[in-house]
């Protein structure tokens, strides 16, 4: 087949065939029929992603490469930040973001074991897990309903002389009160990590400027797992405007190396063999000098290739998510006597990840969810509900050590008991949204 072709000609033919294959076997989806299962999330893609994936595979560059560089550059440009590091998951991104704040390079602002980090228990566990894994103490504050984000009025009662940071997620795409939280962090000289994994594309107006979430704090994180706003299968990102934090993030991501050379590169600094570090002998190969205890958290170039194609489509994804959320909220008008419908935080433009619903008194969440599921609509809890109630906290609860609660978690407990959510992903049609709203209204009868 390729006997008379150059390598480039063969490659172009393979990619053209890949495009045809995708258009024939992947993109001929059956239209939604009433009664079909409606998932809360799904990947949305076309031939562009598959062509990029095959293009990368043909190079057989199995680690990070040209697509990784392209993605990091274009993603940083989209966000309006200077530095972006691609990683293998959103959970790794959160781990890396927090881990960066434990670096001795931060001097008196370094987070040490026993230092406190303010967060919430109503969310996903990997926002909190790095805090515990590094020996710091999460301090849990309650959230507000129907925004499902931290109540900033409770921050002052949570702070202590041990507090070093605030680490919060923008719940299902709804930005938390960034002005209040950022002012609080500035007032107390605290780090702010924005877990932006469920909120890519959301905006918040601060000091008269509309900015993307994840870029207002010191470090932001994203996830590219298939249900998220865009995907590369597995994958995540850490981003910042701070050059020192970027240097630390790259070190921790790449085994803890002091060297900035990418795999396969050598001696970019020109001083590979002529400097002395720690108590190593003069001239020890800088490629193998370690300034941190790090990991290998990089993604592959094949994942990045998919991400590059997704990123070009991303604005349309956000537009559709906003449409779907607004359509669903309009369709559920008249249910407010039984359900609390979600509301955007003030000064925000959410890129919604899901549609959160809290049952009012007299409506049993579990029974309602079961009826909705029986009608083919997939539902989800607000992740952990109240993380403190989970088995991973059993030992800490028993000893009363390892975490602290500031005030009550009344709304957090209510979310655990009464809240669920349904999807608004960009592949949903208006017919699917109508069916979801009908299923909920019928289940309430």
Question: What is each stretch, according to the model?
Answer:
Residues 21-25, 103-203:
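PLP-dependent aminotransferase-like
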Residues 85, 118, 139, 192-193, ...:
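Structural detector of well-ordered beta-strand residues that form the stable sheet scaffold
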Residues 1-62, 291:
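N-terminal "arm"/small-domain region of PLP-dependent enzymes with the aminotransferase-like
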Residues 27, 69-73, 81-84, 153, ...:
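PLP-dependent aminotransferase class I/II
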Residues 215-260, 301:
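Active-site PLP attachment segment
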Residues 45, 63, 123, 146-147, ...:
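Glycine-/small-residue-rich active-site loops that bind phosphorylated ligands and cofactors
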Residues 194-232, 247, 287-289:
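Conserved active-site segment immediately N-terminal to the catalytic lysine
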Residues 66-116, 129-134, 140, 207:
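Phosphate-binding glycine-rich loop
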């Amino acid at each position: 087949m390729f006997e008379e072709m150059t390598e480039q000609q063969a490659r172009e033919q393979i990619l053209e065939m890949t495009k045809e294959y995708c258009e024939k076997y992947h993109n001929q989806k059956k239209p939604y029929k009433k009664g079909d299962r409606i998932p809360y999330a799904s990947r949305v893609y076309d031939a562009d992603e598959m062509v990029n994936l095959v293009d990368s595979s043909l190079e057989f560059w199995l680690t990070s490469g040209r697509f990784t560089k392209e993605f990091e550059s274009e993603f940083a440009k989209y966000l309006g930040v200077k530095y972006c590091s691609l990683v293998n998951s959103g959970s790794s991104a959160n781990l890396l973001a927090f881990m960066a704040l434990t670096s001795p390079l931060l001097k008196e602002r370094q987070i040490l074991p026993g230092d406190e980090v303010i967060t919430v228990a109503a969310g996903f566990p990997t926002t909190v897990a790095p805090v515990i894994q590094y020996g710091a103490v999460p301090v849990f504050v309650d959230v507000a309903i129907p925004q499902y984000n931290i109540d900033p009025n409770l921050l002052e009662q949570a702070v202590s002389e041990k507090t070093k940071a605030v680490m919060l997620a923008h719940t299902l795409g709804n930005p938390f009160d960034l002005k209040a939280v950022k002012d609080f962090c500035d007032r107390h000289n605290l780090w702010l990590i924005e877990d932006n994994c469920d909120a890519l594309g959301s905006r918040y107006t601060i000091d008269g400027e509309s900015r993307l979430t994840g870029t207002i704090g010191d470090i932001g994180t994203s996830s590219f797992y298939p249900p998220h706003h865009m995907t590369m299968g597995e994958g995540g990102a850490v981003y910042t405007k701070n050059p020192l934090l970027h240097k630390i993030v790259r070190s921790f991501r790449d085994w803890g190396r002091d060297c900035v050379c990418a795999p396969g590169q050598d001696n970019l600094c020109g001083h590979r063999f002529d400097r002395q570090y720690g108590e190593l002998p003069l001239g020890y190969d800088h490629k193998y000098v370690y300034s941190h205890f790090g990991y290998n958290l990089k993604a592959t170039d094949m994942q990045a290739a998919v991400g590059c194609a997704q990123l070009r489509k991303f604005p349309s994804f956000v537009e559709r998510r906003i449409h779907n959320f607004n359509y669903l909220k309009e369709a559920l008008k008249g249910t407010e006597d039984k359900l609390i419908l979600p509301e955007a935080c003030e000064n925000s433009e959410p890129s919604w990840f899901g549609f959160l619903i809290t049952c009012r008194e007299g409506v049993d969440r579990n029974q309602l969810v079961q009826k909705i599921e029986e009608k083919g609509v997939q539902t989800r809890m607000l992740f952990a509900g109240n993380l403190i109630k989970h088995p991973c906290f059993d030992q800490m609860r028993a000893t009363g050590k390892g975490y602290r609660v500031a005030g009550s978690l009344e709304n957090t407990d209510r979310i655990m008991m009464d809240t669920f959510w349904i999807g608004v992903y960009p592949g949903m049609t208006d017919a699917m949204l109508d069916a979801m709203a009908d299923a909920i209204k019928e289940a309430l009868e």
